[in-house]
Amino acid sequence: MPELPEVETVRRGLEQKLKNFIIKRVEICRESTVAYPIDKIDFIEGLQNSLLYKWNRRGKYLIAELKKTVSNNNDANEISFVENGVLVVHLRMTGYFTFNNTLTNPCKHTRIRLFDNNNNELRYIDVRSFGQMWWVRDGLSPNNIIKGLGTLGPEPFSESFNVNYLKKVISNKTRSIKSILLDQTIIAGIGNIYADESLYSAGISPFREARTINKNEIKRLRRAVVDVLKKSIGAGGTTFSDFRDLEGENGNFGLQTNVYRRTGKKCRQCKNLIERQKISGRSTHWCRKCQK
């Protein structure tokens, strides 16, 4: 599943590529991709004539601010804009966007197509079809409509994600520290890859009970989370299967991982072999010698 760095990479690509992109036509190729509104006609009509004004990210969600075009009754050439809510996207396991400036037939796994006046197309592709989209009209709160969005913990790059916050939320937790990092209600955006890499960088065993992590270790962990995520964003994220950026390019952070998917290979630091074991059903990669 695309995690924070991959979603941030997509957000930056969309923001750069789709300047002045006004949706003139919406084509739904798979109805289940549209999670809200229930009536798909409302989704189509809600997006039509909307400018994709600004792209934001919250955890693993992409959020596009929309502005509706409104013609002046006295002058057809004069167009103004009014707020039109947001388009929210969750890529889930295999979702990604492509931008096409020539008309082409949709590929097999195309789910949603958005066209502008010049027939430029923003195409959403999703092999496993778990990804979802929501159009939330102006005046309604996406947090109240989209399950999971309103319960997200702080962003790793925010001031709220600090040592005191981490100390407070893990102080009485008997769960493993790895499970804590994966809990989106505690920290938004971290998945399996970056939980493993952050714990390795901090020198903390993923199997430790969260409440046993001392203050110095919390400081190291917070710093590791931020550093690892920034490094991955700089590399365009990680591609191990389906993730692509808007230009169809793979992320390059996978070449730089220290433990993730390096089972049986030598630790880059101590030369011990990297091990793999499951925690709460999730594959966990770690170095027994470097992580205590």
Swiss-Prot record:
Cofactor(s) the record lists: Zn(2+)
CDD domains reported in the protein's UniProt record: EcFpg-like_N
Record field: catalytic activity: Hydrolysis of DNA containing ring-opened 7-methylguanine residues, releasing 2,6-diamino-4-hydroxy-5-(N-methyl)formamidopyrimidine; 2'-deoxyribonucleotide-(2'-deoxyribose 5'-phosphate)-2'-deoxyribonucleotide-DNA = a 3'-end 2'-deoxyribonucleotide-(2,3-dehydro-2,3-deoxyribose 5'-phosphate)-DNA + a 5'-end 5'-phospho-2'-deoxyribonucleoside-DNA + H(+)
Active site: P2 (schiff-base intermediate with dna), E3 (proton donor), K60 (proton donor), R282 (proton donor)
GO biological process terms held by the UniProt record: base-excision repair
Organism of this sequence: Prochlorococcus marinus subsp. pastoris (strain CCMP1986 / NIES-2087 / MED4)
Tagged with keyword DNA-binding: yes
Entries under NCBIfam families matching the protein: fpg, PRK01103.1, PRK13945.1
Subunit structure: Monomer.
Zn finger limits (FPG-type): 258-292
EC number: 3.2.2.23, 4.2.99.18
Keyword Zinc-finger (UniProt): yes
Cofactor note as given: Binds 1 zinc ion per subunit.
Residues that hold DNA according to the record: H109, R128, K173
Gene Ontology MF, one: class I DNA-(apurinic or apyrimidinic site) endonuclease activity
A Pfam family it matches: Fapy_DNA_glyco
Assigned keywords, A-Z: DNA damage, DNA repair, DNA-binding, Glycosidase, Hydrolase, Lyase, Metal-binding, Multifunctional enzyme, Zinc, Zinc-finger
Protein name: Formamidopyrimidine-DNA glycosylase
Family: Belongs to the FPG family.
